[in-house]
Design a protein with these regions (language model features):
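Solvent-exposed interaction patches of small proteins and small membrane subunits
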Residues: 1-85
C-alpha cells in the first residue's frame, strides 16, 4: 500500500537533513578533518535515518500492518520494526 506524501512529510524532512549531513561528512573526509568531528556527524546522520525509519513505520502501521480485511497483522508489524534493528 502506498502512503500519501503529506503523511510522510516529517520523514522526508529528516531524510533531507540526513542527506545534507552525509554530504557534509563526504566533504569533511575530502578535507582531511579530524576523526572526532567525523564521528559526531556520522552519529547525527545515523540518528536522523533511524528516526525517519521509525516515522515511516509509525505512519504506515495503520496501512501496512493490516490485512485486506482491515485487521491488524502482528507479524507484519513485528517484521517492519525488526527491519530497523
Amino acid at each position: 500500500m502506498q502512503l500519501e506524501a503529506t503523511e510522510l512529510k516529517a520523514a522526508r524532512d529528516r531524510l533531507m537533513r540526513a542527506q545534507g549531513q552525509i554530504m557534509g561528512i563526504v566533504k569533511m573526509i575530502d578535507e582531511g578533518r579530524d576523526c572526532t568531528d567525523l564521528l559526531t556527524q556520522l552519529s547525527a546522520a545515523s540518528t536522523a535515518l533511524t528516526r525517519a525509519g521509525f516515522t515511516i513505520i509509525a505512519t504506515g502501521m495503520a496501512h501496512c500492518g493490516t490485512d485486506p480485511e482491515g485487521t491488524a497483522n502482528r507479524e507484519k508489524l513485528e517484521k517492519a520494526f525488526m527491519s530497523l534493528a
